[in-house]
Amino acid sequence: MGETLGDSPIDPESDSFTDTLSANISQEMTMVDTEMPFWPTNFGISSVDLSVMEDHSHSFDIKPFTTVDFSSISTPHYEDIPFTRTDPVVADYKYDLKLQEYQSAIKVEPASPPYYSEKTQLYNKPHEEPSNSLMAIECRVCGDKASGFHYGVHACEGCKGFFRRTIRLKLIYDRCDLNCRIHKKSRNKCQYCRFQKCLAVGMSHNAIRFGRMPQAEKEKLLAEISSDIDQLNPESADLRALAKHLYDSYIKSFPLTKAKARAILTGKTTDKSPFVIYDMNSLMMGEDKIKFKHITPLQEQSKEVAIRIFQGCQFRSVEAVQEITEYAKSIPGFVNLDLNDQVTLLKYGVHEIIYTMLASLMNKDGVLISEGQGFMTREFLKSLRKPFGDFMEPKFEFAVKFNALELDDSDLAIFIAVIILSGDRPGLLNVKPIEDIQDNLLQALELQLKLNHPESSQLFAKLLQKMTDLRQIVTEHVQLLQVIKKTETDMSLHPLLQEIYKDLY
């Protein structure tokens, strides 16, 4: 979860984000030299050396896109703001009492990590009973939605009950020679023909097996469906191969996946539960208990909490840019685009992807921090003084709606690739090859959702609508940064982020 994705740091002599990113892409190098915990590591309880962010001469003085001088950044002096620390024994007792109120806050629906089955060429979830979201198998008798594997075949509840009653009560129906068609709406009209259909498809009292579809049966049916799709559309095999490639790259590029985050939130992991931060005292306790990869100087620890949280977000954003850049390079065709277009696509896409993946770490009550070691409550973040208390609320509102789509990591891998390859970004030089790549990605995404969520016929359209929502969130975020620029004169924005936000919406 904390693997390093690159060994080449940002060149302090680099003139700009453009130069840095261009060199990064063309030389297959990463943008910052640091270990890669996933968003939002150190969020709110930063132990990062953030001195690079503190130069007053750079305080929201956003220079032209090609003129940031990294070598000019120095460490300013900040007046210490002492914290009053609660007695450890009293604090622990109060924390234990308060923690009980928040235990339910970090419970969400489980989501196991998807895996790729060579047999089926599809993404499935191991060690779980298949849910409705995985498969929509028809009843072999009437064509209604099967509820599971009953009496040796896949059958709906109605036909299962009909067959059981017929066998147990030894019912004999009046003979019918019309060979009536049995379907969902007509199945109750002719009991004789319905029973004959049950026998014809293989239902037997010697094969009494209730419950949901076994994994082996599901894989067999998935393989049959996949084969049928390939026969109808040979391109689907290529699209599924693309989906697998993107998923593999996604797993390598992003250390904390949605599946891992959900396992932490639901207690489905061998690691200890995350430390809950819900007020100032628990925040200070968390700083003592949570292990950080970066050590914050003592003078940084005395700063106002809201500022430290904001700066922790900045540091993590810079790391996230590296992860996203690494992933973008794995998208087939991306590195062959015009180098300036690659930079433009990342400039406009990185924050939309950050907020997409941040949703995986959230539920309606809070967000995982520091690689899942901590859980910071939504109410605590909202309680920070304005304008800092307004930063995360739109992200929570988006996350609740986005998580309702029940996407897994294999879905997200394609979706974020679609976001990156958006041909309508301002300033692109050669749009057609970008649109060609995105069109292929959209086809892969549509097929992926049909196979992975067959019961959600509108999911593809709903997901594309989220792209519009993400742009609005980024726009509002930039506007909030402008407010901070005016009200927080001693605050600074990381130079890399300055250039990304420059002329952004």
From Swiss-Prot:
Keyword Acetylation annotated: no
Tissues where the protein occurs: Highest expression in adipose tissue. Lower in skeletal muscle, spleen, heart and liver. Also detectable in placenta, lung and ovary.
Keyword tags: Activator, Biological rhythms, Cytoplasm, Diabetes mellitus, Disease variant, DNA-binding, Glycoprotein, Isopeptide bond, Metal-binding, Nucleus, Obesity, Phosphoprotein, Receptor, Transcription, Transcription regulation, Ubl conjugation, Zinc, Zinc-finger
Pfam families according to UniProt: Hormone_recep, PPARgamma_N, zf-C4
Highest rank taxon of the organism: Eukaryota
SMART domains in the cross-refs: HOLI, ZnF_C4
Residue ranges of domain NR LBD in the record: 238-503
GO biological process, one term: negative regulation of macrophage derived foam cell differentiation
GO (cellular component) term, any one: receptor complex
InterPro entries xrefs: 1Cnucl_rcpt (IPR003074), NHR-like_dom_sf (IPR035500), Nucl_hrmn_rcpt_lig-bd (IPR000536), Nuclear_hormone_rcpt_NR1 (IPR050234), Nuclear_hrmn_rcpt (IPR001723), PPAR-gamma (IPR003077), PPARgamma_N (IPR022590), Znf_hrmn_rcpt (IPR001628)
Activity regulation annotation text: PDPK1 activates its transcriptional activity independently of its kinase activity.
Mod. after translation: O-GlcNAcylation at Thr-84 reduces transcriptional activity in adipocytes. Phosphorylated in basal conditions and dephosphorylated when treated with the ligand. May be dephosphorylated by PPP5C. The phosphorylated form may be inactive and dephosphorylation at Ser-112 induces adipogenic activity.
DNA-binding region extent: 136-210
Glycyl lysine isopeptide (Lys-Gly) (interchain with G-Cter in ubiquitin) crosslink, residue number(s): K252
Effect annotated for changing R316H: In colon cancer; sporadic; somatic mutation; partial loss of ligand-binding
Record-linked CDD domains: NR_DBD_Ppar (cd06965), NR_LBD_PPAR (cd06932)
Phosphoserine: residues bearing it: S112
Interaction with FAM120B: annotated segments: 205-280
Domain comment in the entry: The 9aaTAD motif is a transactivation domain present in a large number of yeast and animal transcription factors.
Assembly and interaction partners: Interacts with FOXO1 (acetylated form). Heterodimer with other nuclear receptors, such as RXRA. The heterodimer with the retinoic acid receptor RXRA is called adipocyte-specific transcription factor ARF6. Interacts with NCOA6 coactivator, leading to a strong increase in transcription of target genes. Interacts with coactivator PPARBP, leading to a mild increase in transcription of target genes. Interacts with NOCA7 in a ligand-inducible manner. Interacts with NCOA1 and NCOA2 LXXLL motifs. Interacts with ASXL1, ASXL2, DNTTIP2, FAM120B, MAP2K1/MEK1, NR0B2, PDPK1, PRDM16, PRMT2 and TGFB1I1.
Name used for this protein in its record: Peroxisome proliferator-activated receptor gamma
